């Protein structure tokens, strides 16, 4: 099965569905006209945007949601700070109101202060954003980005940021502004009257803290799952050893029709391999028509048949990945040969050569011959029984598309018995593969001066490029969740510090009446950890529901992984306990004589 891709532009007014229907009709007519070659050929129309971004669209939405969570936590934090400031300045605001300041003027003042704070934060955020985008782009593999994609902060992003800043200023300034507008003049202007911390405002502060903790827990759970998934991916074997292996892709030039004969191509590749093998530092070299992780899918997939099978039995066989490899391929890539033998120099064409031979993967062997020995079986015969390939070896399974995907059914034929172009060369080296890259290129040009060479890189990079999404998403989720935890911890610290400040006199009275430092410590910690417990419970419940949206991003990790959720709960409790302990310890050390005179 050959997979061909074509890019086209639809006429104005033509939908994707209409194009799909027309392509299917064309495929059906071709199948009817040419049943031997087009009987099972189909056509699928996919918008280019979906082709490039379809698999990562959900990831981008999740990242946008994470940004929104961090923004909400920051809003709650700033709102709490402004509420505290408004409470402390309650008498000042009451004096202004008594001197004729209208409620609208007081509200505008509160919103202006919020806008000033948010503007400063927005300016700093844009600067950090510019630096952050540069760092992010530097972490992305060059090969995975389409040529037309540029990641940068353009005018649209800046306008969006400014709009978000204005909305944020309104959100964080609204609650303090309403508090300012509802100042009780009589109570606030009384001699010695304290700025109140009424039960309503205390509940609002508590609600904001609970919200911060809950959102932080959701982000931490997502980051923890991504981290565990990435760790599993890094420890996953692709079926070969990529360390110290260099990859080169070549584009040989054939000028004559005779150049495409198997005999010439076989001799040409043998000369290239022999010349590369002479380069100092090269232990072994091989060629392959389709190296794992280079393309989106195996270059050639097709039907597989066994000698003696009926046509109905052949329909049950899996589609296999066909690859033409040189004799040392399994040695270079260190793909284990489970049974049988590897290819040799005699597995070629011409006098004295072996007849066509093949090596299949363990998974294919177990699928076709679950209770029999595949070695010696003849496969892919012509209708007259000729042209069969004899299975001479069973190799280990190899992942082709990415570390996330399962291994496929692999069928290896000898490169020296195949018409396929072996455009991928791999060389196992004694040290850093890139250290000998230039010498290997010169060796190729000595044999074939007009051969194009590109995609020169270590095979480890090819492997790493398949998990770039997990690496980047995990990094970004980790950064967002870290910021969220710091903000939530700072928020509860601020609230508890204010709690201690407002109740200093009460604490002094308790100490004067015989309360021990442990009692004061318990009082403050209990008040703070109550909010933590409620926020943690809500956050864990929300995480259990929302992390299911990340299922497609995870590898061998459940979206409700108990270990991850347990670690998140422990981390949040530890961080917030420390945030509560600092003001609690200060409260326990209050001098009762000073506290009783505290205003």
Where are these regions (language model features)?
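Alpha-helical transmembrane segments of integral membrane proteins
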Residues: 48-53, 81-108, 112, 132-259, ...
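Membrane-helix entry/capping segments
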Residues: 4, 17-70, 87-90, 132-163, ...
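Small-residue-rich transmembrane alpha-helices
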Residues: 79, 115-185, 225-228, 526-588
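Interfacial "coupling" helices/loops that link adjacent transmembrane helices in transporter permeases
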Residues: 74-118, 490-530, 536, 590
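Mid-to-C-terminal secondary-structure elements
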Residues: 1-61, 134, 267-469, 475
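Hydrophobic transmembrane alpha-helices
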Residues: 65-75, 167-171, 217, 248, ...
């Amino acid at each position: 099965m050959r997979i061909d891709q074509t890019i086209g532009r639809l006429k104005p007014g033509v939908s994707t569905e209409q194009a799909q229907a027309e392509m299917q009709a064309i495929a059906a007519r071709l199948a009817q006209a040419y049943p031997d070659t087009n009987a099972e050929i189909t056509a699928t129309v996919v918008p280019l945007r979906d082709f490039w971004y379809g698999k990562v669209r959900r990831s981008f939405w999740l990242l946008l949601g994470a940004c929104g969570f961090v923004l909400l936590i920051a809003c709650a934090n700033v709102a709490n700070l402004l509420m505290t400031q408004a409470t402390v300045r309650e008498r000042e605001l009451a004096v202004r109101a008594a001197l004729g300041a209208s409620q609208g003027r007081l509200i505008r003042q509160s919103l202006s202060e919020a806008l000033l704070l948010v503007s400063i934060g927005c300016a700093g955020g844009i600067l950090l954003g510019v630096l952050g985008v540069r760092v992010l782009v530097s972490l992305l593999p060059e090969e995975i980005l389409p040529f037309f994609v540029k990641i940068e902060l353009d005018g649209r992003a800046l306008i969006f940021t400014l709009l978000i800043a204005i909305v944020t200023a309104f959100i964080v300034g609204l609650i303090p502004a309403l508090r300012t507008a509802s100042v009780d003049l009589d109570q606030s202007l009384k001699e010695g009257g304290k700025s109140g911390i009424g039960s309503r405002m205390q509940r609002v502060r508590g609600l904001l803290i609970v919200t911060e903790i809950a959102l932080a827990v959701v982000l931490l759970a997502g980051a923890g799952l991504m981290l565990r998934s990435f760790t599993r991916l890094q420890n996953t074997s692709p079926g070969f050893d990529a360390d110290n292996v260099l990859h080169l892709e070549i584009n040989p030039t054939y000028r004559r029709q005779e150049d495409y004969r198997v005999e010439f191509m076989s001799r040409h590749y043998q000369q290239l391999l022999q010349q590369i093998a002479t380069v100092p530092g090269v232990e072994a070299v091989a060629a392959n028509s389709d190296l794992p992780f280079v393309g989106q899918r195996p270059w050639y997939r097709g039907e597989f048949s066994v000698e003696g099978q009926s046509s109905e039995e052949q329909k049950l066989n899996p589609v296999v990945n066909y690859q033409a490899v040189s004799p040392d391929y399994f040695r270079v890539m260190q793909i284990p040969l489970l049974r049988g033998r590897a290819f040799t120099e005699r597995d070629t064409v011409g006098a004295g050569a072996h007849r066509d031979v093949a090596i299949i993967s363990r998974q294919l062997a177990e699928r076709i011959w679950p209770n029999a020995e595949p070695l010696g079986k003849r496969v892919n015969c012509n209708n007259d029984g000729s042209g069969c390939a004899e299975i001479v070896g069973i190799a280990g399974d190899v992942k082709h598309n990415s570390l996330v995907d399962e291994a496929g059914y692999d069928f290896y034929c000898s490169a020296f018995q195949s018409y396929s172009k072996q455009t991928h060369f791999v060389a196992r080296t004694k040290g850093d593969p890139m250290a000998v890259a230039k010498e290997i290129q010169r060796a190729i040009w000595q044999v074939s001066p007009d051969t194009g060479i590109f995609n020169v890189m270590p095979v480890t990079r090819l492997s790493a490029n398949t998990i770039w999404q997990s690496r980047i998403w995990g990094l970004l989720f980790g950064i967002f969740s870290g910021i969220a935890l710091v903000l939530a911890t700072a928020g509860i610290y601020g609230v508890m510090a204010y709690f201690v400040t407002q109740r200093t006199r009460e604490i002094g009275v308790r100490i004067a009446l015989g309360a021990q430092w442990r009692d004061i410590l318990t009082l403050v910690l209990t008040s703070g950890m109550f909010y933590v417990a409620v926020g943690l419970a809500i956050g864990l419940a929300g995480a259990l529901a929302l992390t299911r949206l990340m299922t497609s991003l995870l590898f061998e990790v459940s979206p409700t992984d108990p270990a991850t959720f347990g670690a998140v709960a422990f981390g949040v409790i530890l961080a917030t306990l420390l945030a509560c302990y600092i003001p609690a310890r200060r409260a326990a050390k209050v001098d009762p004589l000073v506290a009783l005179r505290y205003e």
